[in-house]
Regions:
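Terminal targeting signals and extreme-terminal segments of soluble enzymes
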Residues: 1-74, 80-140
Length: 140
């Protein structure tokens, strides 16, 4: 069982557009980062948000369709699993019902002072999964 999906609206700006007239592929990864961080900031306790930072470890992206200037785009992300300091997300970027990109990503939680990996506590995991954390976290 995954966490509840989280939707994040995206506005396509002129600086997102490349020489081909559509959103540059690299911008999609920025949108994923914006979405994952917004998810964390919305659901995590304030003290966790203040004391933790996130870095991307891995992205696997499949591009389906281009996005264009002024498109109304939504990124929907699902936290699939927490393993120690790592979190695994699946994100789908859409324009209406049309899938523009699908992204699987792995993130590492860091202590914002030491910049060392910081395990996600079971209590914090429960705020995302809404069930006993042991059901969706591992010690890895």
């Amino acid at each position: 069982m995954s966490a509840k999906p989280f939707s994040h609206p995206i506005t396509v700006h002129p600086e997102d557009i490349d020489f081909m007239g559509h959103v540059n592929n690299a911008r999609y990864l920025g949108w994923v980062q914006d979405t994952v961080l917004a998810h964390w900031q919305k659901l995590a306790p304030a003290e966790e948000v203040a004391s933790k930072a996130w870095v991307a470890l891995k992205h696997e992206i499949t591009y389906r369709r281009p996005a264009f200037l002024h498109d109304a785009v939504i990124a929907e992300t699902v936290l699939e699993k927490i393993a120690g300091a790592r979190s695994f997300y699946n994100t789908v970027i859409r324009r209406g019902e049309e899938v523009l990109a699908e992204v699987q990503s792995m993130w590492c939680c860091l202590d914002s002072e030491t910049h060392r990996p910081a395990r996600i506590s079971k209590a914090v995991a429960e705020t995302f999964f809404g069930l006993p954390a042991k059901a969706k976290t591992t010690g890895a």
